[in-house]
Structure formats: C-alpha cells, structure tokens
Amino acid sequence: MYILVWKKGQQIKTFHTLDEAAQFKAASNIDEAQVFSVTDAPDISASGGSNEARNRRRLMYLTNSTNPEECNPQFVGEMARVATIQNREIGARGFLMYSCRFLLQVIEETVEDPDSLFAKFSPEPRHERWIELDNGPCTGRMYGDWNMKDSHLDSITTHPAMLTILFQMARSISCLWSYLQKSERIMLLFGKDPGAQRPEPMRVVVTFTYLVDFGSMLSIPNLTEQAAEVLTTFVDGCVKNVEGSGGSIAKFTTGICMAQWPINRTVEALTAIQQISEDLAQLRSQQAPGSAVSLMYSQAGLHYGRGMLCNAGSRKSDFTLLDFINTTSRIATLANKLKTPLLFHSFDVRCLLGDEMREEIEGAGMHQVKGRDKPVGVYQFPGPELDVEMVLRQKVEQFTPGRFRCQMPVVEYEALPIWQRPPIVDDTPKGYPRPRTMPGYGGRQRSDSLVDRLIMIAKLAGPSVSATGDTTLTTLTYISQATRKPMSRLHLSALMGTATRRNAQQSITGTLLDVNGLFGQTLEGPKVAVVMYLSIRQDARQTDVTTVHMAPLQERVCPSEWTLTSATEEMLATFPPLQDVLSQLAKSCTSLETYVRSTVGYLTAGNNRRNLMPVSCGVVMLATDIGSFTSLTEESSLTEVWMICNTFIDACTSAVCQEGGEVIKRIGDCVTAYFPGNNAESAVAAAQELFTFCRQLREAFVDVVDVRGCVSCGVGLDYSQVVMAQCGSLGLTEYVVAGVSARVMEVDAMTREVGYAIGVTEPYVTDRLSPQSRDHGIVPTPQAIELPCYGIAGEQLELDVDSIKRGIKALHAARSGEMPVTEPEEALRLFRVSPGRVRHGDTGRRSNSAQGKRSIQVR
C-alpha cells in the first residue's frame, strides 16, 4: 500500500499501486508531495506466534440514541470511559462519531471478534435501530487506538455543508432501512453493487399467507377508509410470528405475505402460520363494533423445493424468490377452494416434519393447479371444513361502521390541498440527457449540463420561474459521483463559475461539497426552483444521483452565495476518517434508493414515516409475467432462471419508467406497476414496448438452444381505486399500493386465452384512451365473459401461446438429446377475432350492465 502525503501532512490518501498515486498527483496538480510505501506487519499473539493468518474485518454501524436530548458530551464521555477499557482489552481499534440523535461507530478487529462484539452490545438500552453499514475484510489497520474524544460533529468540522450532508444521510438510511427485508439489508447496506451479485441457490420452505377476500373490502367505502389499519395489523402480525420463529419475510404485497424458512425449521414454519391465524381470531374477538379488523381471516399455502434469493434488475432492483414461488401461490389459492386454513404441497415437506406432527396430517388428494402438467398431491391438518370466504362475505354484507373511527383513515387524494398531496409517480429522468444543439448558443454542440438546462427552462418560463409557482422555502440534499476522477481544479473552477451564475438567477443558495469525486450538494430556495432542480438533476458529469433529503425550511442556513467547497483541506485534516465515513454512507444511500421506490424516498425525506397520510386515488394498474414460466424453468438451471428474470424485469422496469409509471412489486417473474389515472395511453405504450422486446428477444435466439428464445409475456391493464398507505410498525414497514390487484392479474392471465398480448378492461381503461385508440386500436374479446375486456389490435401484438409451448418442449427435448415430438398444426381457435376497425357502437362493446360480474376475484 502506498500513501500520498501533501500540504505539509494535512492531506493523506492511500493507493494500491505506485502508478495510481502518480496519476492522482498529476491530475490534481499537486506540486509538493511525498509517497510512502507501507507494509502491514502481522500481529503477535499472546503466545508469541504470528497472527498473520487471522484476517481483520471492519465493522461500521449506525444507531439512534434512545433519548436524543441526553446525547451530550457528558453522556458520550461516560460511554467512552467504559468502551475504551473494554476495547483496549480485546485489541479493537476505531472511533465513534455522534451528532444529536445519531451515533456512528467503526471497529477494526479479527474475523470473530466484531460479530460477537456487535451481538454483545446490540441489546444496549441506550441505543435503538442498529444498522450495519459495513462488515467486511480490511487489509490492515486504518485507525489508531480507540477514540471517543472530541467526536461530536461540531468538534470535527463547523462547515454547514458537511454537517448537513452527514446528518441527512444518517437520517435517510435510518428511515429507509426499515423498508428492506433482513436478507436485503445484509447486502445492500454494505454498499455492494446490486448488479454484480450472483444468485444464491438454496432449499427453503416458502409460505404464502393472504387475507381472505381483501379485495372486497376495497370495494365498500366504509371499509376502504380502514384499509390502512387492516394492512398495518396484518404486516405486524406476520413480522412478529415469522421472524420470531426463525424465518424471514420475502415480500409483502396487497394482503399477501411471502416468507421463507430454512429446511430444518419446517415445523416452526407451520407453527408460525397457525399462530398468525390464531392471533387474527383473537383480534377479531377484541374489536369494537364497526372495526374492519373484525373481518380479517387468513389462509396459507406451504411448499418446499429448490429456489434462489437473487437480485433481479439493475435500473430499479429487487430481490425475488424463484422458481417454485408460483406453485406456492397456487397452493394457497387451492386452500381456499378446499376450505382449509393451511395446505402444503410436496411429499418432502411431510418428511421434514417431526414424528408427532407427521402423524397428525392427512392427505387432501390430487389436484390440478395452473402451471403444472400433472396433478399435485397436497396435505392438510384434520379439522372441520370452514368456508372462510362465505363467512366473510356474510359479515361484509352485514357490516356497519357505526360510530367507530379508525386511527389511520384513508383520505381522497383529490380532496387534499395541492401542497399536501404526496407524489404518485417519480418524474425524474433515470438516464443521461442527450447532447443537443440549442438555438441561442451559436448552433454549436453543447454538453447539456444541469445548470444549462435550468437556465433554458427559466428563460422559457419568463423572467422568473418562481413567479407562478410555489415559493415555499425548501431545502434539498443529494449526493452523486463524478464520472471523471479525480476532479482537477480546472474542472471544479469551471463548474463553480457556471453554477454560481445560474443559481443566482433562481434565488438558489447552497453549497456543493467535493470529497475526492464524491459530490454532496445542499440547496435552499423556492420550492418550484428546487423541484425543477430535482427533476433535471442528472447530467453527464455525475452518476448515481441520490436524493437524501427534501423538506420545507423556515429560514436559510447556507451562505448568501452559492459556493463550492473541496473537502481536502481543513475538514479532513481535523478528522481523517471523515472521508471514509462519508464514502460509506453515500454507498448505502445509493443502494437504498435503487431498491426502495422513488416515491417512497421522497415521502420519507424529511418526514416522519409514521405520519404519512393514507390516500385513495384512481390509477391504471399494469400486471405482466413470463408466459409458461413454470414449464420453462422446471428443467432449466437456476442461473438460467435468474438470467431470464433479470432480462425481463429490466425490460419491464425500463418501459414503465420511460412512460411515466411506477413499479410496485417484482414477485418471481411477475411485475406490477401503475400509471396516473389520466395516463392510460402511456400504460398501453409501455405494454407494447415490453411485448416488442420479448418478441425481438425470441427472434434473436431462434437458431440457438437458449431459454431466452422462449420468453414471452402478456400484459393486463385495469383502472381501479387504490389506497396508498404506510403499514407496519415492528421494525419492518411497507408502503403499500392496495387495490383490486386480482382483477388486473386476471386480465393478464386472460391474454393467453384470447390470443392478444395486451388486454384492457372495459369500460375502465377503454374510456380513458384517446378517441383514435378506441375506434381503431382495440378489438373485442367475446370469450372474456366474467370480466369484459378488449385486446390491443395489431398483427405484431397477437399472442400465439401454443407456438410458445411447442418451442419450450422442443428446447427441453433438444437439451436432453431426444427428438422433439412433431404435432399436427392445430386449427385456429374459434374465438380468435382478427384485428380490425371496431367502433364505439359495435356489438362487441360491453354495456355497463355487465359490471356486476367484475367483482369476482380470481387469484
């Protein structure tokens, strides 16, 4: 390791090679500097032997003080007195830094000690919400002896930009951390690149627990008002029982909890599912008249098999369980049909149970489920049949709220004042803007920088963009990485001169902090100008732009002029580990924004997530999945399953975000999203783009034996009222978009039957299309009786399911060395309607009298 020292020892930077140090010195225009070669000498154990083989690890964690008002120098001094003695005894080195309510600690020790040390002090009553930011190997000692002296931020630096950025990043991580499941936190908060993580094969027990007939609650106004409270109760009950029994939550969606357990905890999994049902029964008996919690019933399905926990997607990523998760969901649906609270599949599950529990179970017969060519055998615990859906439907019909008032009432979105309405979709561009030739700049090619776009919009809007917008004083903090490292003084000077002039015209003050290529910026100004800054925030000179904090401000804190500060002078000289802390916090913030929906990040930035108001609004729902996914992946390797899911989810996310939509969930191979209610045309455009991508992918691999040559999809679109609410309070929270999701999933499944890739409900979506699309772009589907819908016309949008299934069989046959079975060409389906001109008044158009059958839930 090589250390570059300049400015009389005030600046220090480490490099792996001598060439890297020389390149940095030349690019930064450093004149007087010295380079030292440092070799890490092995420690000597107590017995005199060498401990060179003992790898060191660095543990970095962030906590909240239980009593922030008591977090003063005296409080930290008492902690320092005890901690210094203990850490000297075990040879731990590191430091602690605190600011008001947040404490950040770094410890360097051997492989075994940090984990045991973390487990030892994590129950500390003076701290809460322990968040690991780093727990990985380190090549050598980076810090001296344990030090907690003068560790308050005010003692480290008085620069307002550094104080603000560090504090806001700590608050953002502490808030968004609770939206991640346990497995996600382990990887993401260490700042690892999500796209570089390979899938993790495993054998687990997976359960689907869902609220029975939850969709009917959303169709009754008196019950819709209590939807947020019902979901919060359900989330808390699942978290308590699943994590308390050694399992982990895989995903929450509308009224459904997906969880997983190790194979040696099958008994605990069954016990936890039964306990959830018993807890809901106890809650029902304790509710006051008019409470919707009295209508909560659960049913579950359990399945054991191969799978993997993997990262799918890169633009907006998520963890997903594959590939038997689809079968588990259908087993849960079968439990409702068989009128049993718990049903599990696979003889392997029966073998994993203990002798006592194995004697209690009984077979429930062989049943055909969707996605399986052969019937599957299921098991259940003996007991009286209970038609939960019928019992619940009777209770719903007789339900009267009376004088009961829930704690989290749902409010109509349109009824809120404009300044109180939460953002529904993220309109921030995710890619780099293309360079363009702008008139007025001499017709020459310009780099379309952030400040140039800002001044261009300001000129188009008039003398001042704030004259017609919200002038509320607002603060914005975001971080980004420089595309060119290191940033020379010449580049920083050019950035400073242009930005100062542009921001002065918009009454924006603030500071841009540069820490060796890491930018942290704090802005203060009128809300309309700050929001515009946020919407066009990315240019070719910076990447990984992440919003850290955005909230109203009482008065300006930053200096009157916009300044650029390089954190290579006094700040880092006062406290050298500051750069390391800032870099690690930035990595964690960037990873969190990748996995947490953008709208959730905006809602929680500067707000207490417990105070988020549940709202109800109309949106266009989108649901899509890979066709014949079960048969495609049964004989494919897990790496191939991950590859096609990663490709499909990336394409779907890109299409949705490009058209102004918001992705809700990625569940296995299924993706759900929504668009604003007045943006049905964009939803159709996103669906067309996704289907076109799948068709082109198949054409690209038509002559190759590859699973990507069999990827197809259908897309369902439906308009419905949804409830957006913050749910959960026991360590794991979820910002849900609850609607009649079963209906849009039904439309997605119906595309396979009617032969059209895109299905839209009538009149929900069709009435929101443009007149030209209604008259020329949609085709009736007479086979869709239970749920009237239309297909999007076009020869390129026809879905030939039989051809795709034959391709999957041919793929598996070619891989196994068998000759593919040649089947005679099947006749065209009688219900196929060729694309054509269908007007509003055609007989295929459904009347409003058919709406009575749309409430049927198909899961």
Swiss-Prot record:
SUPFAM superfamilies: Acylphosphatase/BLUF domain-like, Nucleotide cyclase
Boundaries of every BLUF domain copy: 56-149, 473-565
GO molecular function: blue light photoreceptor activity; FAD binding
Sequence ranges assigned to domain Guanylate cyclase in this UniProt record: 620-748
Compositional bias of kind Polar residues: 846-859
Primary location recorded for the protein, binned into one broad class: other
Subcellular location: Cell projection, Cilium, Flagellum
A GO cellular component entry from the record: motile cilium
Short name of one Pfam family: BLUF
Chain residue ranges for the region called Disordered: 426-445, 835-859
GO biological process, one term: cyclic nucleotide biosynthetic process
Keywords: Cell projection, Cilium, Flagellum, Repeat
Gene3D superfamilies for the chain: 3.30.70.100, Nucleotide cyclase
Note: The 1224-5/1F strain is deficient in phototaxis. It is not known if this is due to defective adenylate cyclase activity or defective BLUF domains in this protein.
Family named by the database record: Belongs to the adenylyl cyclase class-4/guanylyl cyclase family.
Subunit annotation: Heterotetramer of two alpha and two beta subunits.
Protein's recorded name: Photoactivated adenylate cyclase subunit beta-like protein 1224-5/1F
